[in-house]
Amino acid sequence: RKRLFYRYYSHPGNYMYLGHYGRYYNMLHNCNAMLLAHQMQAMRRYQHRMRVKQMYRRIKMKQMYRHMKWMGMYRQAKAARLRCI
C-alpha cells in the first residue's frame, strides 16, 4: 500500500513519523519492523549502487570497444602506408 512520508508532521495513521525510516520510527510499533525497514533500505541502497556501477562499467566497455575499433583502423592505415613505401 502507498506510504506517505511526512518529515515534520505526524498524525495517528502515520505512527508519529520522524526521521527517514517510514512509519516504524516510534519503537512502540515494533522494533523488528523498524530493523526490517532499515535492513530493506540498506539492501535497496546496495542494489542501487551495484546498478550504478554496472552502468558505468557498460559505458567504459563501450568506450573501450570504440577505442579498439579506432586503433584497428589506425594500424591498418599504418600497414598500408608501409606497403606503399
Swiss-Prot record:
It is found in: Secreted. GO terms for molecular function: toxin activity. Expressed by the venom duct. The keyword Secreted applies. Is lethal to drosophila larvae. Turritoxin PaIAb was only sequenced until Met-61. Belongs to the turripeptide family. One of its GO terms (cellular component) is extracellular region. The keyword Secreted applies. This is Turripeptide PaIAa. Keywords: Secreted, Toxin. Its main location: secreted. It comes from the Eukaryota.
